[in-house]
């Protein structure tokens, strides 16, 4: 199973970019990050491979505790999903065609987060899910 983050805008060399890199390097799954031009561009999403799932990061999405997020990923892995795609929009959010491509929506709570920070938060949650599923002591709940 591959993790694929598809995001609008270039994160470049920034504190958020460093966090994304730090957490993604720790993942046990292979991963790919695709940066698309920002909202002004008509660049389409890369095609979804067969048996993949697409999760749009959106403030109106479902919120999952870290354990629930890990269980979702574990279930998708057990189902033999080829790729889990996470879509992160530009500063103004997701485009209509990006929303339409999503199988589900996930939110980091009710607050609105900057899109570059959302990437870092997603990278951390992916690492946390990997740690939970492997029994690593990184996650402490309670």
Curated annotation (Swiss-Prot):
UniProt-listed Pfam families: SPOUT_MTase
Sample GO molecular function, one term: rRNA (pseudouridine-N3-)-methyltransferase activity
Domain of life: Bacteria
Catalytic activity of the protein: pseudouridine(1915) in 23S rRNA + S-adenosyl-L-methionine = N(3)-methylpseudouridine(1915) in 23S rRNA + S-adenosyl-L-homocysteine + H(+)
EC number: 2.1.1.177
Enzymatic class: transferase
InterPro entries: Alpha/beta_knot_MTases, RlmH-like, tRNA_m1G_MTases_N
UniProt keyword terms in alphabetical order: Cytoplasm, Methyltransferase, rRNA processing, S-adenosyl-L-methionine, Transferase
Amino acids binding S-adenosyl-L-methionine: 89
GO cellular component, one term: cytoplasm
Cystine pairs: none
Location in the cell: Cytoplasm
Subunit structure, as described in the record: Homodimer.
Function according to Swiss-Prot or TrEMBL: Specifically methylates the pseudouridine at position 1915 (m3Psi1915) in 23S rRNA.
UniProt record similarity statement: Belongs to the RNA methyltransferase RlmH family.
Protein name: Ribosomal RNA large subunit methyltransferase H
Organism: Zymomonas mobilis subsp. mobilis (strain ATCC 31821 / ZM4 / CP4)
